[in-house]
Each structure stands twice: as structure tokens, then as C-alpha cells.
């Protein structure tokens, strides 16, 4: 029978000093026999996805206490990728994932907490906390802040839905007046919550449902809706029950590594491919698998992507569908239900809320549910009022979207495409693979051959695009922006948005060892591995070369003879300490980022740290 971890600092005569400090936090005599539950919150006033979380940790804490536990809240950092986008701030985004994971580990282990509630939401916070939960392997549950309502604006006598990407694209479109751009800017992000499309934050919060670590609706019920409060309350009650099951009944099935197995990662990437999730999810799932000790690789993602259909298309893949529309169609449980009926899901796996996923689907999949409360839950609608307050409205749709032939969520027979929304490409320029979000690529350019235009940084590429140096048929190559080469693996949302604003969204491709925002669409191929800074062939590409892209056959090829590439590699290696570094790039890299770069790996392993580089 495992002992409560907290007894290390609460039991015995020698812990009198520690207990004195615990008492100073408000603990009483009777509390020292209870499970101590850590609440990792991520409130910050910098990030709209987190601005409403300030009081939600204490909401969970009160529920933990009512269920017989002791709650102790702490906070992590949170970087807003949208605000950090397009300047040096983006260098810090991916490294913040490791800091978040480490900070959760530090706090939980230093204070010997028994279990963990993760209150996350945006791009690197959910992955960082997921990595920490799997690293710690104590009872854990996730509850996110929820998605933002989609923006609305009246445009040419018609009301259209908006999101962050629309503001970026229109701002770079010279045909849009200042007044039009201002109207979009003021309407694109109307409420608190994670940005409203199937971008990275929402993708990751949806994937926690598939992994079995969060409650139904976690990925889709709006931050502003009153229904979301119940997720926080249920999370507080559930985590105390999980702690007692593990420590008092020796039930290890509640531990993260018991729930998030190889098959659970298969479920997660199956959902990801089916819903056309952000390419960043691949990076984060690979990193999480490493923490879980699960041998889940790019090869597994490639295998799954070939057999899973695309059942759902959400912005940026389509302009008029957002997460609130996915919720109305039954949310993630509805997509998982369709995947299960197609024989593509491991439904026998446990979750934090049900004995098996199959049991959960029998209750929560609207196509097989019988409980009217479930139907009402998925009718939760946007309030349409700008606000930064959680649970501030209770509007409902009159009816659900149950149309599986032409609706937001499709069944397999009526899938958008029979191949899924993400694909892994391999070739001589990406021997360890690269990722493309096929859900956002027009099928007319699934095969594409173009002339290479080489840029040594995102900034240089933006200058080239806005300076009209890119024409139809070009392939923009941005290198030395990987985890090590950036460092920090910047997102390339501005270059792709500017290509769209120039009318080149279906006429050009972009290839990088960096990554893309979940808001990216078009023929945008990222995560090229090995990256240029690690000796990858993308570092050998020259201006005017030709690259062949073949998504149906999962192939990408630099059309240069092998002997020429061999000669280029020899010439590069002959540069000594200047080899595999960007020529002419002026970029200040702080000591913190240099430390990250020294340990990080390429995207094919999740951009995780390799501590063997410093082990003696």
C-alpha cells in the first residue's frame, strides 16, 4: 500500500518544524491526515486565455476541502504566443514549456503533494503541465480555462465570424482600409479564453479528453459559459477520490502513466488527425510520450495519419466554424464516438471520470446518449457580449448540430477527406520527417513543385514577402529556426498570413525547421528534422533549387543530385565553428535561451532536452 507522499513533511516528531510552517498556511490538526492536493494554476493578466483564472483555483480548492482534502494552490508562468508573435518574444514560447513542466515538478516534489489539479489553457501551458503530470506520476486531472467566443463583425451587410488570424491577414492586406482593419481588430477576440479556432491551445485541451485526463467538454465548452464552472467543481471532487483510491486502496489505475499508455497516445493522435488539430500537437505529444516513458514516435503518427479520416474542419481550415460550433455538434466526445464506430479508437482504456472510454461515450456521445442533461450541456452557446469574466452567461442553442452528413462533425462515410488532417512527409530534405496540416491545404496543391527562396530567419522572410520578392510557384524556405537554431523554434504565423494577404496562399509553399501557429493554413510544412543547426539537409538548400512536395505519397524531395549534396555538406563542415549557423543573421540570444539551446533536440523527438549532453 503506497504511503501518502505528504506524510514525509507532516508526520513524526522530526517534522515539527515543517508542521509549524504548514500551520502558518492555515492547516489545522485534522488536516495532517488528509491528502494534500496541489493546484497548479496559470493565471496571468498578460494572456486572454488565462486572465479569468484568478479565482478559479480557489473554486477548485473549496471543492477539494469539501471532499476531505487539503488544497494548496501555486502559479506557473504563461506566454501568449499571439502577443509574442512576429518578434524576439517568440523565441521564449517553446522554452517556456520546459520551465512550466519543471516548475510544477519543483513545487509538487518540494512540498510532497499527493495529487495534482492542472488549471491550464493556452499553447505551452497545457503541454508543460502534461509533461509534469506524466513525470511525477501522481493522481492528476486537467481542467482548462476554456475557449474564447468567436468574434463577429458586420461586413458588407453580412455578419461574419472572426478570429485572431483574420486581424493579422487583413492588417497586411493593402486593399483593406484603416477603418476596416480597426473594426476587425476590435471584434476578433471579444472574450476571455483560448483563441476560438482549432489552434494549438484548443487542440491540446481537446486532446486531454482523448488521453483520458480531463472531463467531457474540457476542450470545447466556452470560457464564458456557466456550464464550465461544473468542470472545475467536478475536478475538485474527482481528484480527492483519485488520491484516496491510490493511497488508501492501492489502485494504481488512477495514475497518469496507467491512463496515458501507448494506446492512449494512439487515441490522441487519432483524434488530432480527425479534427485537423494544430501541427504543434505533434511536438507536444512526442514530448509527453518521452516523459511517460512511452515509445511513441513520428513513425506512429505517420502510420495513424494514413488511415484516419478528417471528420471535422475548424478555423483556420474553414473560416466560418469555430470551437463553439464543435461543442454544439457534441464536442470531442462526439468525434471520439464517430472514431469508435469506425473501429479507430481504443475504447477499452480508462479515464479520470469513467472506467473505460466506451462507458464515457455511452453517456456523453450525443449520438448515443439518453440523458437530457447531456444534450443541454452541448447546447451551451456564445453570449455575444465582450467580457473577461468566466461563467458570465448561460445562453443556449435551440438545437444541437446532429447532422453527420453535412454538419460540423461528420461520420466516416461522409468525411471531409478519407485521409486525415495531419500528415508526416519524409525525404532527403527531412530524413526524420516534417509535418503538414493537410486540413488547411487546398487539395489542388497537395502535389507542388517550386523554386526555392532561402531565408536565414523569420524576419528576413517577412521582409521578402512584404517586399513582393515572392511570386507564384515559389517555395519559401526559412531555416535555422528550429529548437536549437532559433533557439526556441519560432512560430511562422506572420509569414503564412502575409502570403495569404498577397494572394499567394494557394500559389506558394513554405518550408521550415521552425513551427507554425495553430492558426496557420496553406501549404505550410514545418518541424523539418534534423533541423539546420543539427546538420539537417535544409541547411544545404540553395537559392533557385527545386523542391517536390507530394502529400498523397508522404514525400518531400530536394531535387539536387546526391553528389552535389555531398559536396555541399563537405563545404559546410569545412567552415569549422561557423558551420551550420545562419549567415549574416543578427540576433541577440540571452543566457537563458543559450542554456535551452545547449540541451534541446530537433522536432522529431518533441524538442525535448537531452540531459545526456551534460552528464559526466
Swiss-Prot record:
Keywords: 2Fe-2S, Amino-acid biosynthesis, Branched-chain amino acid biosynthesis, Iron, Iron-sulfur, Lyase, Magnesium, Metal-binding. It catalyses: (2R)-2,3-dihydroxy-3-methylbutanoate = 3-methyl-2-oxobutanoate + H2O; (2R,3R)-2,3-dihydroxy-3-methylpentanoate = (S)-3-methyl-2-oxopentanoate + H2O. Binds 1 [2Fe-2S] cluster per subunit. This cluster acts as a Lewis acid cofactor. Its cofactor is [2Fe-2S] cluster; Mg(2+). Functions in the biosynthesis of branched-chain amino acids. Catalyzes the dehydration of (2R,3R)-2,3-dihydroxy-3-methylpentanoate (2,3-dihydroxy-3-methylvalerate) into 2-oxo-3-methylpentanoate (2-oxo-3-methylvalerate) and of (2R)-2,3-dihydroxy-3-methylbutanoate (2,3-dihydroxyisovalerate) into 2-oxo-3-methylbutanoate (2-oxoisovalerate), the penultimate precursor to L-isoleucine and L-valine, respectively. Belongs to the IlvD/Edd family. This is Dihydroxy-acid dehydratase 2.
Amino acid at each position: 500500500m503506497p504511503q501518502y507522499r505528504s506524510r514525509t513533511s507532516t508526520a513524526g516528531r522530526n517534522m515539527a518544524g515543517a508542521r509549524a510552517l504548514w500551520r502558518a498556511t492555515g492547516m489545522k490538526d485534522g488536516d495532517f491526515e488528509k491528502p494534500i492536493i496541489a493546484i497548479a494554476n496559470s493565471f496571468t493578466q498578460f494572456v486572454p486565455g488565462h486572465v479569468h483564472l484568478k479565482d478559479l483555483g480557489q473554486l477548485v480548492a473549496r471543492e477539494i476541502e469539501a471532499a476531505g482534502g487539503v488544497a494548496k494552490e501555486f502559479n506557473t508562468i504563461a506566454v501568449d504566443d499571439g502577443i509574442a508573435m512576429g518578434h524576439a518574444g517568440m523565441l521564449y514560447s517553446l522554452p517556456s514549456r520546459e520551465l512550466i513542466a519543471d516548475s510544477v515538478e519543483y513545487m509538487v516534489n518540494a512540498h510532497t503533494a499527493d495529487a495534482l489539479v492542472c488549471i491550464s489553457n493556452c499553447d505551452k501551458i497545457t503541454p508543460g503541465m502534461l509533461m509534469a503530470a506524466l513525470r511525477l506520476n501522481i493522481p492528476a486531472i486537467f481542467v482548462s480555462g476554456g475557449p474564447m467566443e468567436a468574434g463577429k463583425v458586420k461586413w458588407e451587410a453580412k455578419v461574419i465570424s472572426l478570429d485572431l488570424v483574420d486581424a493579422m491577414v487583413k492588417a497586411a492586406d493593402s486593399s483593406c482600409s484603416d477603418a476596416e482593419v480597426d473594426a476587425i481588430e476590435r471584434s476578433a477576440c471579444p472574450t476571455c479564453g483560448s483563441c476560438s479556432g482549432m489552434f494549438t491551445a484548443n487542440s491540446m485541451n481537446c486532446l486531454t479528453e482523448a488521453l483520458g485526463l480531463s472531463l467531457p467538454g474540457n476542450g470545447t465548452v466556452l470560457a464564458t459559459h456557466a456550464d464550465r464552472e461544473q468542470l472545475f467543481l467536478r475536478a475538485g471532487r474527482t481528484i480527492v477520490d483519485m488520491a484516496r483510491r491510490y493511497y488508501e486502496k492501492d489502485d494504481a489505475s488512477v495514475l497518469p502513466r496507467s491512463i496515458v499508455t501507448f494506446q492512449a497516445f494512439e487515441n490522441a493522435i487519432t483524434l488530432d488527425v480527425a479534427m485537423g488539430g494544430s501541427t504543434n500537437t505533434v511536438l507536444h505529444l512526442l514530448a509527453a510520450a518521452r516523459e511517460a516513458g512511452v515509445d511513441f514516435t513520428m513513425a506512429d503518427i505517420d502510420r495513424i495519419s494514413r488511415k484516419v479520416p478528417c471528420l471535422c474542419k475548424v478555423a483556420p481550415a474553414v473560416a466560418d466554424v469555430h470551437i463553439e460550433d464543435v461543442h454544439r455538434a457534441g464536442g470531442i466526445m462526439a468525434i471520439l464516438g464517430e472514431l469508435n464506430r469506425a473501429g479507430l479508437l481504443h475504447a477499452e482504456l480508462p479515464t479520470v471520470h469513467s472506467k473505460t472510454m466506451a462507458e464515457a461515450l455511452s453517456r456523453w456521445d450525443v449520438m448515443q446518449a439518453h440523458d437530457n442533461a447531456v444534450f443541454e450541456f452541448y447546447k451551451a452557446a456564445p453570449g455575444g457580449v465582450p467580457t473577461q469574466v468566466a461563467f458570465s452567461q448561460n445562453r443556449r442553442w435551440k438545437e444541437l448540430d446532429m447532422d453527420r452528413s453535412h454538419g460540423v462533425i461528420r461520420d466516416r462515410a461522409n468525411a471531409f477527406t478519407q485521409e486525415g488532417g495531419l500528415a508526416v512527409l519524409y525525404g532527403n530534405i527531412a530524413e526524420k520527417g516534417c509535418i503538414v496540416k493537410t486540413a488547411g491545404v487546398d487539395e489542388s496543391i497537395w502535389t507542388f513543385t517550386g523554386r526555392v527562396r532561402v531565408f536565414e530567419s523569420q524576419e528576413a522572410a517577412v521582409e521578402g514577402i512584404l517586399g513582393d520578392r515572392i511570386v507564384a510557384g515559389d517555395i519559401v524556405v526559412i531555416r535555422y529556426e528550429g529548437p536549437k537554431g532559433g533557439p526556441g523554434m519560432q512560430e511562422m504565423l506572420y509569414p503564412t498570413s502575409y502570403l495569404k494577404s498577397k494572394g499567394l496562399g494557394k500559389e506558394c509553399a513554405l518550408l521550415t525547421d521552425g513551427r507554425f501557429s495553430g492558426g496557420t493554413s496553406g501549404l505550410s510544412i514545418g518541424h523539418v528534422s534534423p533541423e539546420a543547426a543539427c546538420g539537417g539537409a535544409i541547411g544545404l538548400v540553395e537559392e533557385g533549387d527545386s523542391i517536390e512536395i507530394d502529400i498523397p505519397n508522404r514525400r518531400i524531395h530536394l531535387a539536387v543530385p546526391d553528389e552535389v549534396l555531398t559536396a555541399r555538406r563537405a563545404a559546410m563542415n569545412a567552415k569549422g565553428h561557423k558551420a551550420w549557423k545562419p549567415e549574416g543573421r543578427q540576433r541577440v540570444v540571452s543566457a537563458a535561451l543559450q542554456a535551452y539551446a545547449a540541451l534541446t533536440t530537433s522536432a522529431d523527438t518533441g524538442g525535448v532536452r537531452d540531459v545526456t549532453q551534460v552528464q559526466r
